[in-house]
């Protein structure tokens, strides 16, 4: 929360102008060159938030806890998007998700059994989020910033169409495979392990446990630590620890990728030391090509599996 709040504070002047544009007041911003108007962007954010809050309220969740849950959810998504955009990691997952905070932190006694059950379902879209739209789209917008306005808007429309087709196609595929072959015969995580986690979390909420003040206290300590790390980095150029790593350092995904990050850092240092900035700039195309090639091979084997009816060609799943 502090990580996101500090970012919003730094951009407060820009965000204030965005809000003025939404209200139709005079501002210092011109959105003619953006992929969409600021009014459309803010309207979408508000409508989406109200819809999600209304969905939880309709399911019997108290209004206050619904608002708090969506606030935490959007804060986590925003923070992870910044981590992906600034650090360059391909995927990341939050160590603490909104459902765990509400159920295990605030406790089932405070939020109620119905809310705990509803929030446990939030694991589906708010916990297992190694790849999520905000992070992917943020990188996509960075890649197209050199295009003209018309081309950028075409790409944005293509992204929206891809999202809709992906939703429809994935839902159909899951249902078709589940009814035809049986979900238990498919991915153990999605059809066995993850539903078990959701069920156990919901049952824990039904126990009506009190608020976990010790855990909330450690949350406060983490907030103070983030403030200190950010302050030290801004005041001392020699400080080696970037605060962007603090919110994700206990994520299991980091355990998988830390050596790759370290290895990439070593390569970058060597290129800059012996080749300079010019060589580093030219070398980026090569390393981007490695990433594209890796994903192309994965997608290619997926097509081969579909055409031949074979399985067991693993795709990088993180």
Predicted feature locations:
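Alpha-helical multipass membrane-protein architecture
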Residues: 1-318
